[in-house]
Amino acid sequence: MAVRVAVAGASGYAGGEALRLLLAHPEVEIGALTGNSNAGQKLGALQPHLLPLADRVLQETSPDVLAGHDVVFLALPHGQSAAVAEQLGPDVLVVDMGADFRLRNPADWEKFYGSPHAGTWPYGLPELPGGRAALEGSKRIAVPGCYPTAVSLALFPAYAAALAEPEAVIVAASGTSGAGKAAKPHLLGSEVMGSMSPYGVGGVHRHTPEMIQNLGAAAGEPVSVSFTPTLAPMPRGILATCTAKARAGVTAESVRAAYEKAFADEPFVHLLPEGQWPATASVYGSNAVQVQVAYDAAAQRIIAISAIDNLTKGTAGGALQSMNIALGLPEELGLSTIGVAP
């Protein structure tokens, strides 16, 4: 029997990516598509690549429209998911691709988002220690942010194996789709092409507390994070370069062994052969993650680099993967697409 899925926020990048993946899922029937500001328009006018759904008309996001579905994907701006979710029954699997339910500490939410904390849901990054167990049978899932996905997968093996001191320095470049679909002057082609620029510098980026939360859980102690995001002249993808001071006695061999153990059975995370480095082009449009790690003996630092597609593994692919686990379906179902090259 097909799993009936609704997507709220179908006109945006995250909602569109979710639909692209859901179309390839053999157990899914796509139900209601909503988009408040675009209600009444055909999806094809807003997401012309979704040809099988082009004639579907967007509806307003309301409990009546979303009723009668097994799963509801929420692709809404932060602060809007909670109001919709509380109107959906406890038997509906709600997968929130926004930020509302990711953080455990209410003070972190209020500091970085400036509104009351809505609560915390099981976290949709199965590769983290205990991640799959938290998702199995769950009816509520908080999909991680794109940067925290890339950073957490790059660094958690070092912290879980007690190889790194509890402080990390991260510089990550992201494609422009990470900023959403709304028109913004700094995202105009003439502003972005041929240029890279940092933003959210000095610990103010909203994904910072999520990284601290994940790495601290892996380490078993608080981890400080210095995070500098950079806007790259590409539509999608994240390349995260993460460094942490190594503990005494660490060797290149012990670092490599920790990463091999962490990712040995992971279907989507690929620890590359030594000497090969992650590239966003290699994971474009896929749920794959490329990871490489090195040990700088002179500086006594562990360097871990990851590449993801921010819209796929970083958002909608991670959502679909988590949905599969929650429903007891094979984890890779609907996610067999590999990267596009060149």
From Swiss-Prot:
**Subcellular location, in the record's words?**
Cytoplasm
Question: Which GO terms of type biological process are on file?
Answer: L-arginine biosynthetic process
Q: Enumerate the GO terms in the molecular function aspect.
A: N-acetyl-gamma-glutamyl-phosphate reductase activity; NAD binding; NADP+ binding
For this protein, what reaction is catalysed? N-acetyl-L-glutamate 5-semialdehyde + phosphate + NADP(+) = N-acetyl-L-glutamyl 5-phosphate + NADPH + H(+)
Report the EC code(s) recorded for this entry. Answer: 1.2.1.38
* Gene3D superfamilies attached to this UniProt entry: Dihydrodipicolinate Reductase, domain 2, NAD(P)-binding Rossmann-like Domain
Mainly localized where?
cytoplasm
Q: What is the role of this chain?
A: Catalyzes the NADPH-dependent reduction of N-acetyl-5-glutamyl phosphate to yield N-acetyl-L-glutamate 5-semialdehyde.
What is the protein name given in its UniProt record? N-acetyl-gamma-glutamyl-phosphate reductase
